[in-house]
Amino acid sequence: MSRIGRKPVPIPQNVQVEIKDGNCVSVKGPLGQIEKTFSPLLTIKKVDNQIVVERPNDEKFVKALHGLTRALINNMVLGVTQGFEKRLELQGTGYRARVQGNKLVLEVGFSHPVELEIPTGLTVSVQDNTKISVKGIDKELVGQFAAIVRSVRPAEPYKGKGIRYEGEKIRQKAGKAGKK
C-alpha cells in the first residue's frame, strides 16, 4: 500500500467536509472553501472524524493516484485552517514591486513595468518594495502564481539579480577570466 495514501486525513473541529458523487470533495473552514474532483478509480469515505482514501487494486498508476489524492485532500484541509504563503524577494538596482488594484506591477529592468493579474482567492502584499508575499487557501494556486512571478526575471547566476524565493540559494558562477 501507498504509505501516504494509507494514512487517514484528520478533520479538525472547525472544518466541515462533504463528499459528493463519491469523488468530489468540498472542504469548508474558517479561511474559506475549496472544492476538488478526484479520480473515480479511488473511493473516498468520511469515517468518524477522518477522511479515508481507498484503492481497488495494486496497479502502479492507481498506487500513485492513491498517495496523490490523500496529499491533495490533506492540503485542502490545511489550506482552510492555516492557509499557505510563498515569499519572494527582488534583488537588483532599481528593482521594485507594488500592488495596484488587482494587479502586481513589477519593475525589474525591462523598458516597461510588467503587470500580472492577481487570481481570485489570493492576496498579494509587498513590503519595502522588494519583498512579495503571496497568500491563499489553495496550495496549488499560491505556488503557481509565485512561480509565474519568479519566471518574469529569475535570478541570474553571475550577480544574483532577479526574483527569487525567500531563502533560495543561487549558485554563483565566475565571470570571464579576462586578458593578462
Swiss-Prot record:
**Sorted UniProt keywords:** Ribonucleoprotein, Ribosomal protein, RNA-binding, rRNA-binding
Read off the Pfam families from this record: Ribosomal_L6
Superkingdom of the source species: Bacteria
Record InterPro entries: Ribosomal_uL6-like, Ribosomal_uL6-like_a/b-dom_sf, Ribosomal_uL6_a/b-dom, Ribosomal_uL6_bac-type
Report the Gene3D superfamilies cross-referenced here.
Answer: Ribosomal protein L6, alpha-beta domain
Q: Which GO terms describe its molecular function?
A: rRNA binding; structural constituent of ribosome
One Gene Ontology term from the biological process aspect of the record: cytoplasmic translation
Q: Which GO terms describe its cellular component?
A: cytosolic large ribosomal subunit
Annotated function: This protein binds to the 23S rRNA, and is important in its secondary structure. It is located near the subunit interface in the base of the L7/L12 stalk, and near the tRNA binding site of the peptidyltransferase center.
- Family affiliation: Belongs to the universal ribosomal protein uL6 family.
Tell me how this protein assembles. Answer: Part of the 50S ribosomal subunit.
* Protein name as catalogued: Large ribosomal subunit protein uL6
In which organism is this protein found? Dictyoglomus turgidum (strain DSM 6724 / Z-1310)
The top of its lineage is: Bacteria, Pseudomonadati, Dictyoglomota, Dictyoglomia, Dictyoglomales
